[in-house]
A protein has these predicted regions:
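Non-catalytic cap/lid and distal C-terminal segments of serine-dependent acyl enzymes
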Residues: 1-166
Length: 166
């Protein structure tokens, strides 16, 4: 199809999305076989954003973790910058270079574990641009109190679709 425009799904931990040999723990989400097994799924563009292995714990959290198992080490707190990269660099590039439906209604974000944490944060921070979230097994225990305070301050969009799997 050379004329169609498509919704976009952004996945965090992108190395885990397509192929098990590239996945962090040797097992991927197998997105391509899942799409092939379900021909009724609407066509979409899947953007799999790899993490920076050494910075994953920092970039996938907007807040510092309440405790660290390594004395003198603090993790987290770079999620705002990561979000700006995704929403101000990656998304505009994808929308410019590919035939996307760039509006909020056709933009989704998915992540699991720490990827779930950054998905829920970015989904709230950019509610005006992200219409659907898939949050799977988020690691909220790392900064639950900070996230709760954050939610309390946000005006939530009641029509944002959020799918949570714990």
């Amino acid at each position: 199809d050379t004329d169609g425009r498509y919704p976009v799904v952004y996945f965090h931990d992108g190395q885990n999305v397509f192929y098990s040999k590239e996945a962090y723990v040797g097992h991927s989400w197998k997105v391509i076989p899942a799409i092939k097994r379900n021909p009724d799924i609407s066509r979409m563009i899947v953007v799999a954003i790899d993490n920076d292995g050494l910075q994953r714990m920092n970039e996938y959290s907007a807040w510092k973790y309440k405790e660290s198992n390594i004395p003198g080490m603090q993790f987290g707190g770079k999620g705002v910058e990561y979000g700006e990269f995704v929403m101000d660099v990656v998304k505009p590039f994808i929308d410019q270079e590919y035939r996307t439906l760039a509006d909020r209604e056709h933009t989704a974000m998915i992540g699991s574990s720490l990827g779930g944490n950054i998905t829920q944060f970015l989904g709230l921070e950019y509610q005006d641009q992200i219409g659907c979230l898939g949050v799977f097994s988020s690691a909220n225990w790392l900064h639950q109190e900070a996230f709760d305070r954050y939610i309390e301050r946000k005006n939530l969009y009641p029509d944002q679709r959020i799918y949570i799997y714990v």
